[in-house]
């Protein structure tokens, strides 16, 4: 009798569970939980895969950069060096003329960034608020500059700057940036125009009632509210100028008195022999350096890491503001 009663209780419990399980409310909650869990798993796998693709080569090159030059031809060394050394950084520093080139590159990028911000912000504000005859056509031409490669206009640019006597000087870069013709200026004008167009017109109307003119309204009202666009454009302008080789080569900006990291990295082969001769280790890998592509690739990678390091450090300090500004300006992709 007790056994039958026990089985009956189990059956009742099972029936209650089945009834509760099939209730629409619980069924919806269960389906929602499954979808959320599945979405989280897929998202996590995707992010791990993306991080691996991005971080794997960086970590690999970072470990290889501490490999002693004598281990270059050692097939047993794949990831972890057998002999740890900073000799590669010492050689790369000589190849890049690193301390001097770092200061020169930072100076060029920073001043160019400030000039780009000033010129493109003014142009973006004019296109968004100051409607004048032909403004639509002019803005269309600005958009076209985004898709036209800089190589298409390099010949007239070279001729004009040569006639102005600006070749071999960083003033050529400053002039282009200040006139809204710098690297990717069309994109920056588009960003500022879109941002200013999204601000309420009541801000300007209030300023005009108080007697503010166009420039005062721009400087005191519009620009302080464009913090997101300023951070976005500023970072892009700085990084793109930092990595530029096209205009630096076209206008012959790089020279012994004003070395640039990007150009020294581009010509690492030419500087490597001089650096090794200077250090008295031209045969440190057992043969002529030009005959050893592994050593050449190693020094190139180390030089790239040294060039990239200041940008990574800068990004660590501004990553929060940069992400917020990207969300405000609506840039995707």
Which role fits each region the language model picked out?
Residues 4-12, 20, 39-333:
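A structural signal for multi-pass alpha-helical bundles of membrane permease subunits
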């Amino acid at each position: 009798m007790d056994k039958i009663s026990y089985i009956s209780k189990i059956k009742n419990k099972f029936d209650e569970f089945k009834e509760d399980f099939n209730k629409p409310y619980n069924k919806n909650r269960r389906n929602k939980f499954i979808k959320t869990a599945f979405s989280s798993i897929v998202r996590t796998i995707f992010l791990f895969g993306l991080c691996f693709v991005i971080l794997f080569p960086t970590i690999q090159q970072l470990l290889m950069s501490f490999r002693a030059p004598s281990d270059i031809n050692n097939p047993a060394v794949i990831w972890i060096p057998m002999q740890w050394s900073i000799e590669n950084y010492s050689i790369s520093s000589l190849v890049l003329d690193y301390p001097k080139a770092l200061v020169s590159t930072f100076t060029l990028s920073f001043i160019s960034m400030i000039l780009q911000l000033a010129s493109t912000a003014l142009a973006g504000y004019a296109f968004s608020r100051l409607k004048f005859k032909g403004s639509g056509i002019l803005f269309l031409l600005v958009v076209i500059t985004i898709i036209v490669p800089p190589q298409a206009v390099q010949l007239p640019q070279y001729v004009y700057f040569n006639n102005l006597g600006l070749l071999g000087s960083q003033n050529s870069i400053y002039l282009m940036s200040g006139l809204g013709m710098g690297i990717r200026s069309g994109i920056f004008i588009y960003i500022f125009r879109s941002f200013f167009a999204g601000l309420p017109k009541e801000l300007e109307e209030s300023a005009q009632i108080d007697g503010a003119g166009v420039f005062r309204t721009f400087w005191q009202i519009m620009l302080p509210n464009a913090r997101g666009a300023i951070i976005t454009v500023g970072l892009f302008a700085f990084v793109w100028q930092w990595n530029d080789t096209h205009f630096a080569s076209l206008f012959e900006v790089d020279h012994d008195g004003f070395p640039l990291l990007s150009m020294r990295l581009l010509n690492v082969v030419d500087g490597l022999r001089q650096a090794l001769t200077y250090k008295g280790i031209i045969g440190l890998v057992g043969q002529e350096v030009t005959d050893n592509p592994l050593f050449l690739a190693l020094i190139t990678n180390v030089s790239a890491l040294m060039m990239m390091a200041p940008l990574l450090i800068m990004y660590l300090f501004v990553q929060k503001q940069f992400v917020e500004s990207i969300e405000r300006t609506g840039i995707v992709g």
